[in-house]
Amino acid sequence: MSATVPEIRSENLLRYTVIGSRRPSVYFWAVALTGGGLGFTLAGLSSYFHRNLLPFSDPASLVFIPQGIAMLFYGVLGSLAGLYQWLSLYWNLGGGYNEFDRRTQKITLVRQGFPGKNREVRLEYDFAEVQSLRVELREGFNPRRAIYLRIKGRGDIPLTGVGQPPPLAEIENQAAEIARFLNVSLEGI
């Protein structure tokens, strides 16, 4: 699954949707952590109350200290980690879009954050502020394929989302399309 998906392409507007936390791996970990945490919590409570709360095993025969309390502790931790994963999915952390508008000569980068006053992070730049587009390609154990917007006096701003690196051809095509649209040079390819 790609980190950015082209949404709108026209002569005057280019918009890419950035997938945040709503990736298949996050769904998998949310289910696994919630299920495991619930199982361990019920096993710990079964050993405390001496009553079987799990249909597929008999944790009521466990001694509460140290096995039951350890299982209860790990169950609560797993459940909290699962809750965090579900909330990050609900809030779509990191999701947003990159919009390049020729009419207004503006670049708008929007990302979703945690709830509160600054939930939506919105960055706006003029086309004139853009120095170039940089592509980072790093292979190996921890591969990285990313596109950065170089802004004069401000450094590099990532345009691609996190997660599984997109295919090389997709990164190259997207970077070339954005560089052509902005009429700037492309570095790193």
Swiss-Prot record:
* Subcellular compartments: Cellular thylakoid membrane
Query: Which Gene Ontology terms of cellular component type are present?
Result: photosystem I; plasma membrane-derived thylakoid membrane
- Membrane topology term: Multi-pass membrane protein
The record's annotation in InterPro entries points to: PSI_Ycf4_assembly
Keywords from the named record: Membrane, Photosynthesis, Thylakoid, Transmembrane, Transmembrane helix
TM region positions:
25-45, 62-82
One of its GO biological process terms is: photosynthesis
Question: Where mainly located?
Answer: membrane
Q: Which family does it belong to?
A: Belongs to the Ycf4 family.
NCBIfam families reported in the protein's UniProt record: PRK02542.1
Known function: Seems to be required for the assembly of the photosystem I complex.
What protein name is recorded for this chain?
Answer: Photosystem I assembly protein Ycf4
Organism whose genome encodes this protein = Synechococcus sp. (strain JA-3-3Ab) (Cyanobacteria bacterium Yellowstone A-Prime)
Lineage, uppermost ranks:
Bacteria, Bacillati, Cyanobacteriota, Cyanophyceae, Synechococcales
Gene that produces this protein? ycf4
